[in-house]
């Protein structure tokens, strides 16, 4: 992956947000004593900070060159696994309780990994990262199902949207010229629509002062989806999805804080 000036700037912003949230987490009363979940989130933030530090420094020193596999790849995978552990602690149901939804999520991640490899030709990073990311996405599916935050129609619409998104991305690879640009724009708009719907649901839940379980489920799902979006993006759309990702990091913090404080 290569870094542009705008991407480095967005990385600096996310780094600052992660540092801010980490400091606030460390100041929470009872952190590490009353809730193991806060600790998992804290560790995930630490890994995110190391990942962003590497990304920003490398981007500044080697602008426009492809980043080789390095320690930051391990940090990125650790972020996904630790966030998944956060959810699994609150929502301990096994994957087979929701086989259809989990299987669909696994297929989406598998298809995404294939596309990542086509774009980057980085087999090892993409496969290892995909395994960690897939575990997080499946954990989000279980959390959403447990809290019943989506109707049956919403699940079907989400499944259809994911199928269309993969089809559009394949179309981008197999076509050229205006047709390829059309597929690309449609894919970006579809990803943004998904983010908008999750964000709207999250804002609604926060306004209603819902319980921490629902807030964890929706904010972690938003982070996961927006991560998938910027993995499939470039240029200004990459920055857009990255900013949305930062918003969900802050929402995750509010949800975890509510859980730690027992609010």
Task: State each model region's role.
Residues 10-24, 36-61, 72-82, 101-117, ...:
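Hydrophobic alpha-helical transmembrane segments of multi-pass membrane proteins
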Residues 20-23, 141-142, 162-263:
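C-terminal transmembrane-bundle signature of multipass membrane proteins
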Residues 2-5, 24-33:
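Short, hydrophobic transmembrane alpha-helix segments
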